[in-house]
């Protein structure tokens, strides 16, 4: 594997450097070819590097930043006042070619806006989408987008998301001829918003997309599709609901039920079941799939969950490594060119799309 350099916004997220810096060291331990640029306040970063050995320090560089974009800041205001912030400087390192990708757990709206401003969308893409790869009950994986970058999406954007998701499924998840579905309130053709029905009509006309129709939310983890496309509002609510249910389920498995008198054999049986079920469903733990790629840009940007712990942020770093190694932006650009050889034209005020 060739050497690669990532830029980390270590000040972002709910816990800042106390999580991101140890996660960076963990990532260095796992990948001997990795170099990390830690962007943030040196006074907050340096003490957390006390346990780093000489070899790790040789692959670390602190890039001082003057400020941090607050997680509750309005994106428009945050972008206007972003110069010198850890988030903006992290993206600028990618733009300048000093880093091949970046990772941030900061303000999602600000990250989306700054990434679009600095790195620019690929030709043929209106707006980037947040995408993640979720495990399903068949022990496979499903690519899901958009997860919150775009609250409102017209049919053109949904079609573009489908193309990008299909490329990601093939190139990163290594699923040949991935099945693509639109998230909807029913499987019938007449169900759903106009934007969803119009996107469905366009997807049926694209030979390179293995479009299978609509999928309902209760089938998200069944493995019935390899790529699931939706608008950012729906995707964000769906993902967080699923994560909450999974965390509650795993928490219940670990509960010991203190204060309840039970026979020794019932306690033994319970502990055996806890260990067995925890192992069986551990792949659904949200920490293991943290890191949503901001897909559709000319560079690689990974958005970590703001509440990520050390393990989860390290997973987000690994997501960035994989995206760089698989050359995801370049492959999406190539697919768009093959699907839309003469460009993409919006019709009906953006309510539908067609090839020309």
UniProtKB/Swiss-Prot annotation:
Physiological role: Catalyzes the reversible formation of acyl-phosphate (acyl-PO(4)) from acyl-[acyl-carrier-protein] (acyl-ACP). This enzyme utilizes acyl-ACP as fatty acyl donor, but not acyl-CoA.
A Pfam family of this chain: FA_synthesis
Name this polypeptide is given: Phosphate acyltransferase
Compartments, record wording: Cytoplasm
Pathway where this protein functions: Lipid metabolism; phospholipid metabolism
Lineage, opening ranks: Bacteria, Pseudomonadati, Pseudomonadota, Gammaproteobacteria, Enterobacterales
UniProt xrefs under HAMAP family: PlsX
GO cellular component terms attached to this protein's record: cytoplasm
């Amino acid at each position: 594997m060739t050497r690669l350099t990532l830029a980390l916004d270590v000040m972002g997220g709910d816990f800042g450097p106390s999580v991101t810096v140890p996660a960076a060291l963990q990532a260095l331990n796992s990948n001997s070819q990795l170099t990390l640029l830690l962007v943030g306040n040196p006074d907050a970063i340096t003490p957390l590097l006390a346990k780093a050995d000489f070899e790790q320090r040789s692959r670390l560089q602190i890039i001082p930043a003057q400020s941090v974009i607050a997680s509750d800041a309005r994106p428009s205001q945050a972008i206007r006042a972003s110069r010198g912030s850890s988030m903006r400087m992290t993206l600028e390192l990618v733009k300048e070619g000093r880093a091949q990708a970046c990772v941030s757990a900061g303000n999602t709206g600000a990250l989306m806006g700054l990434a679009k401003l600095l790195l620019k969308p690929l030709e043929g893409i209106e707006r980037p989408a947040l995408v993640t790869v979720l495990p399903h009950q068949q022990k496979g994986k499903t690519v899901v987008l958009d997860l919150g970058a775009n609250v409102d999406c017209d049919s053109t954007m949904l079609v573009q998301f489908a193309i990008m998701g299909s490329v990601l499924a093939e190139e990163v998840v290594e699923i040949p001829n991935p099945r693509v579905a639109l998230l909807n309130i029913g499987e019938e053709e007449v169900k759903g918003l106009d934007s969803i029905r119009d996107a469905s009509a366009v997807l049926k006309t694209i030979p390179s997309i293995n479009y299978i129709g609509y999928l309902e939310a209760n089938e998200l983890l069944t493995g019935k599709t390899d790529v699931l496309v939706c608008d950012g509002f729906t995707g964000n609510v769906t993902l967080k609901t699923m994560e909450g249910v999974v965390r509650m389920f795993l928490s219940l498995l670990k509960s010991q039920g203190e204060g309840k008198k039970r026979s020794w054999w019932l306690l033994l049986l319970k502990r055996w079941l806890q260990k067995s079920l925890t192992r069986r469903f551990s792949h659904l733990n949200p920490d293991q799939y943290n890191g949503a790629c901001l897909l559709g840009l000319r560079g690689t940007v990974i958005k970590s969950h703001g509440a990520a712990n050390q393990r989860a942020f390290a997973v987000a770093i690994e997501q960035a490594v994989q995206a760089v190694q698989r050359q995801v932006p370049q492959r999406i650009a190539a697919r768009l060119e093959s699907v839309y050889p003469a460009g993409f034209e919006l019709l009906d005020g953006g309510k539908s799309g067609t090839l020309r």
